[in-house]
Amino acid sequence: MKAALALEDGTYLEGKAFGAERGGLGEIVFCTSMTGYVEALTDPSYKGQILMMTYPLIGNYGVNREDFESDGVKVEGFVVKELCKNPSNWRSEMSVDELLKQYDVPGIEGVDTRMLTRKIRIYGSMKAAIGIGDVDREKLVRKAVEQPFISDIDLVDKVCVKEAKRFESDGDLEVVLVDCGVKMSIVRQLLKRGVNLTVVPYDFPAEKIKEMNPDGVFISNGPGDPARVKPTIETIRKLAGQIPMAGICLGHQLTALALGAKTFKLKFGHHGSNQPVKDFETGRVFISSQNHNFAVDTKTLPKEFEVTQINLNDHTVEGMVHKDFPLITVQYHPEAGPGPHDTYFFFDRYVDMLREYR
C-alpha cells in the first residue's frame, strides 16, 4: 500500500506503508542508534513524536517482548529507509510490521531518511504527518501544519501509571518512583541494587510521599515539555532537601525547574545511543543513551547547583548535584535500554547516597 510523509515546511515524500493502515501526526525526530528499535518504539519518552531511524535497514532481528520498555508502542509513527520483512533471530516473536499493526501505529518505508535527517539537523525538528493510501498532498501538509506543537500537549498524563504500583527486590531500601513515563530498564536497574519501588503517578502529592517515609525519591524520564508537568515540579519543590532524590532525563529537567532554573527546547533534540558525555570529577568521557528535546539552561542554574557533566557535542548540561543536600540528576539515560552500559554507576551512586543519609 502507498504512503506519504509531509512536513510542516511543505516537504512531501512518497513511500510504502507498513503497520497500521491509518495516518499519524507528531513531531518528527531522528534516532542515530543502529539497533535497539524495539526499545525505542516502546519508550514512553517518544510519545507525541514520529520516530525516524537514521540507520538504513531496520527490523533484521525482529521483535521480542522482553525488550519492551513499557506496555506497548508509544511513538505516533515510524519512518525507515528499508524495513526487513523476514527477520531472523532465535529470540524473535514477530516482525516490526506485525508489532505496529498490533498497537495501531502507522509506518512508512522507502523514503530518503538521509535527506530528512540533514533537513532536521539544519532547520530543527518539525511537525509531520503520515498518510496512507491515495493521499492529497496539500491536505497532508495542512494536517502537519495545523496540529498542535509538542509543547502545547500534556503528554506525561498519557503514559504514566494511574495508581500506585509495587515492585519488590531482595533488599531493604524503600524508594518512591514518580512516574512521568518510566522505562522498565530503570526499574530493573534499581531492583538489581536491592531497592523496593513504589511507583506513583506524576501528580501524586508530596504529603502522601512523606507519609510513606521512603529512603529516597526518584523522578523518572518522560515525554514533552517539562514546564507543563507542574504537579511533579511542585512535588520536587516540597521534598527537595527533606528526602534524598534523583532524577533522569525529564526528571532532571523538572528538578532544575523546581529549584529555580529554566529549560529550553533543543533544535533537534538528542535521540540515540552514541552521545558523548564528559564527567568533570574524573575527566572521563562516557558514551550515553539519550532521548530528549529539552535541556536545562546553564545560565539560570542557582549557585547551589554544581554541573558535574556536559555533552561534548553541544555543551548542554548532562549532570548536576546540589551542594547543600542529597540530590543528583542526569540528562542522559544511565540504564541504556538500548545503549552502552558506561553509566550504570549512576544507580550505584544513588544507592550509596540513600544508605549514607538513611
Swiss-Prot record:
Covalent S-S links between cysteines: none
Region (CPSase): 1-172
EC number: 6.3.5.5
Gene3D superfamilies per UniProt: 3.40.50.880, Carbamoyl-phosphate synthase small subunit, N-terminal domain
Active site: 249 (nucleophile), 333, 335
Pathway given in the UniProt record: Amino-acid biosynthesis; L-arginine biosynthesis; carbamoyl phosphate from bicarbonate: step 1/1; Pyrimidine metabolism; UMP biosynthesis via de novo pathway; (S)-dihydroorotate from bicarbonate: step 1/3
Residues annotated as binding L-glutamine: 45, 222, 224, 250, 253, 291, 294
Residue ranges occupied by any Glutamine amidotransferase type-1 domain in the UniProt entry: 174-358
Recorded GO MF terms: ATP binding; carbamoyl-phosphate synthase (glutamine-hydrolyzing) activity; glutaminase activity
GO biological processes: 'de novo' pyrimidine nucleobase biosynthetic process; 'de novo' UMP biosynthetic process; glutamine metabolic process; L-arginine biosynthetic process
Pfam families attached to this UniProt entry: CPSase_sm_chain, GATase
InterPro entries: Anth_synth/Amidotransfase, CarbamoylP_synth_ssu, CarbamoylP_synth_ssu_N, CarbP_synth_ssu_N_sf, Class_I_gatase-like, CPSase_GATase1, GATASE
Record's keyword terms, sorted: Amino-acid biosynthesis, Arginine biosynthesis, ATP-binding, Glutamine amidotransferase, Ligase, Nucleotide-binding, Pyrimidine biosynthesis
Family annotation (PROSITE patterns): GATASE_TYPE_1
Source organism superkingdom: Archaea
HAMAP family listed in its UniProt record: CPSase_S_chain (MF_01209)
Function: Small subunit of the glutamine-dependent carbamoyl phosphate synthetase (CPSase). CPSase catalyzes the formation of carbamoyl phosphate from the ammonia moiety of glutamine, carbonate, and phosphate donated by ATP, constituting the first step of 2 biosynthetic pathways, one leading to arginine and/or urea and the other to pyrimidine nucleotides. The small subunit (glutamine amidotransferase) binds and cleaves glutamine to supply the large subunit with the substrate ammonia.
Record family assignment: Belongs to the CarA family.
Protein name: Carbamoyl phosphate synthase small chain
UniProt source species: Archaeoglobus fulgidus (strain ATCC 49558 / DSM 4304 / JCM 9628 / NBRC 100126 / VC-16)
